[in-house]
Amino acid sequence: MATTNTIEGVNLHRRCFFGAAAVSIAVSQFGMMGSAKAQSDETRLSAIKPGAHTSFGPLKQIDAGLLNVGYAEAGPGDGPSVLLLHGWPYDIQSFVDVAPLLASAGYRVIVPYLRGYGTTRFLSSETFRNGQQSVVALDIIAFMDALKIEKATLAGFDWGARTADIIAALWPERCKALVSVSGYLIGSQEAGMAPLPPEAELQWWYQFYFATERGRVGYDKNRRDFSKLIWRQASPKWDFDDATFDRTAASFDNPDHVAIVIHNYRWRLDLADGERKYDDLEKRLAEGPVIAVPTITMEGDANGAPHPDPAAYRNKFSGRYAHRTIKGGVGHNLPQEAPQAFAEAVIAADRV
């Protein structure tokens, strides 16, 4: 059974302790139980077993910026908005159990496919298939504009956490609160060129593979087997079945998937150019901007993917902050492996 170890708040609570008491503890850990309003806003979450849900309702599509974005939506249309952002090699299925939990708590939950995944498509065949970090964040800003969402709680992991971090840092007026797995993930090409200790470099083996033409062709040819290998390495204790993987892997059939993934990782190493029109944004991100919105960072105790130590990024968050380590063999795909803990963090971060 997974447990949550929380820094800067109550020390420990069991993830199986659900219902109003669980949310009460989650909120108090974030230092928000001092007011009568906070206490009256407690929400009862139903207990959920990871993997209880296998699909969303009918997907929606909307033109937003350079894309026609595919997305799932749950919960009341007039509820406070929460955007859940996935990473690589994952998709919206990472939140298939989180979304109904948050919807039952009254949130409008929106889960988009990032560029290069699922049913999201470029509006023009002429658009450069760019995977650099600032562009993915701009996609989400355009998506929020298209849905007329002025401000939302943003929560994600991997690419999704980085995207949420960027929006919180550069456009804090659009981000009510932040939940970021593995913390502060904003990077730069300069930082990406710095050598790491050998063991750390080994964890990034796929990035160096993608730097070669052989790697691009190999990923294109073997994207499902490749992604399943990454799942196993990133979440070594997660006993997912083939059906769970296959539901996500269908998203990798997107015609732009390989181009976006390869460009993303080559751009990080300064082996591929971005677009000049985004240079100013990248310069700002390279400065490592501090995030001031209320934030909860999270980490699984069995994350086999490269990730920073929480102490290394603590000073990157200047507002209300807590860190939660989710124990019990939880790996990189934290929302899908520990949906209850992730949903609790979203509610706690939102209720400042």
Where would I find each of the regions flagged by the language model?
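N-terminal secretory signal peptides
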Residues: 1-16, 23-26
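C-terminal segment of classical bacterial N-terminal signal peptides
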Residues: 28-35
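Boundary at the C-terminal end of the N-terminal hydrophobic targeting segment
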Residues: 36-40
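Flexible "cap/lid" subdomain of the alpha/beta-hydrolase fold that forms the substrate-access gate
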Residues: 41-57, 66-69, 74, 81, ...
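Conserved beta-strand scaffold positions in the cores of enzyme catalytic domains, especially
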Residues: 59-61, 109-111, 323-325
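Conserved HGGG/HGGXW glycine-rich cap/lid loop of the alpha/beta-hydrolase fold
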Residues: 74-119
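Catalytic histidine-centered segment of alpha/beta-hydrolase-like enzymes
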Residues: 330-338
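C-terminal alpha-helix
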Residues: 345-352
